[in-house]
Structures are given as C-alpha cells and as structure tokens.
Amino acid sequence: EQIYSMLGISAEVEAFGNAVLKDLKERFEKIDAVAEYNQAKVLRAMQEERVDGTCFAGSTGYGYNDNGRDKLEKVYARCFGTEAALVRPQITCGTHALAIALSANLLPGDELLSPVGKPYDTLENVIGTVPSACSLMEYGVSYRQVELMEDGTFDYPAIREAINEKTKLVTIQRSKGYAMRPTFSVQQIGELIAFIKEIKPDVICMVDNCYGEFVDVIEPSNVGADMIVGSLIKNPGGGLAPIGGY
C-alpha cells in the first residue's frame, strides 16, 4: 500500500485493480497453459529433429548442406503438423510470404476466392484489386470475395454460390487485421474449410495465419488447411525477429 501511495495511487484505485486482476485470473491461467503447451511442443520438435549447436553456425547463404536451415524447416513442419515447411529470412514480411504462396499456386485462368471479405490493404496490390504491375489479376488470375454477415460470421450460402469450376485457391485471413470484424478461431476456420471441401474437395484452402500462431494448442493446419502462411516478425519470432516468413 505504501508503494502505491508513494506513486499517488489511491487505495480505491488499488482495490479496483486487484478486483479486476482477480476476475481475470482464470483467463490468465488459460493463456499461461496454452503458452506452456506450445513451448513444450516446440522443444519436443527440436528434440525429435536433433537440433544441436552445429545448427546455429553461420551460413554463407550457399544452398547446399545448410544443416540449420534444413532442421529449422523440419521443426516448423512438426510444430504445425504439415508435410513440409518453407521458413526463410529472405521472406521480408507476411505480405511477401502470402505473395509467394499465391503466385506459386495460381496460374492464368484460375480464380482466387476470399470468403472473409477484403484482405489486408497490402494484399490489394498483390491480387490486383488496386492496379499494380505483375499482380495476380494482370497475370490472368481472377478474384472474387464474399462479404461476412453483419454479425461477422461466414455467409455460407453466398460462399457456396461463389465457388465454381475455376476456383483454385481459397484464402482465409484469420486475424481481423484493420477491419471491424472478429478474429476467427481455429475451430471456426476448421468448420469453414470442411464446408468448402464438401463443395470442391480439390480446392486449396490457405490460411493467412499472421498474429495467430501459438495462441491456441492447435493450428489451422490441424483442422484441414492445406497451407498456412505467416511472418516471423510476429508471434513465431517472439517480437525479436526483424525479418522472415514461412
């Protein structure tokens, strides 16, 4: 009490703060449990891939025999439950990672669908909704999006109608980004993917996982996503990595 009074904080404010902390105790405990689980998951992946001191040796950038890079990608694949992973410092940000994923999987004549409304502003130039050189639309890829319902949920009838024979890839932005809509849980994304796969089993379901890594004990790749994309600058880098993506 004396410490708070020295800072000019009244007993009433201190009591209010303690009451709020008590109300949030259960929530904080759940967050701590998720963090502990994911820490153990990462450590186990490193053990299974036998990460050792040699993996942290400097690299000339030459592609062959880069043991650290190879094992890092195997660790990521284990953590996210995928067949493989591409994790590189040469990927500068999440938008760069998404651009790589989209351009690698879409050809002229294919169609890209966003069932969660407009994606990040930075992707507009990549897709071509804002005219840009070498965009997907300039390359011959068409694009359509389905807006969310007023309550922020998926418009399933409109999504069903939007999927057609040209739909090659569906991109699902997990984070709300800069929009006034909810951030989707892994469970919600899993339900959406299952719905889409029932309509067109061979469509590629890609999740923009930026800001979503390790906030749950499962990832979108554990509930049907064919590909997840993100940035090392955010959650995976712990706020320390200045660059990188997967």
What are these regions, as identified by a protein language model?
Residues 3-25, 32, 42-48, 52-55, ...:
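Conserved PLP-enzyme active-site core in the AAT-like
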Residues 58:
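Aromatic- and Gly/Pro-rich donor/ligand-binding loops
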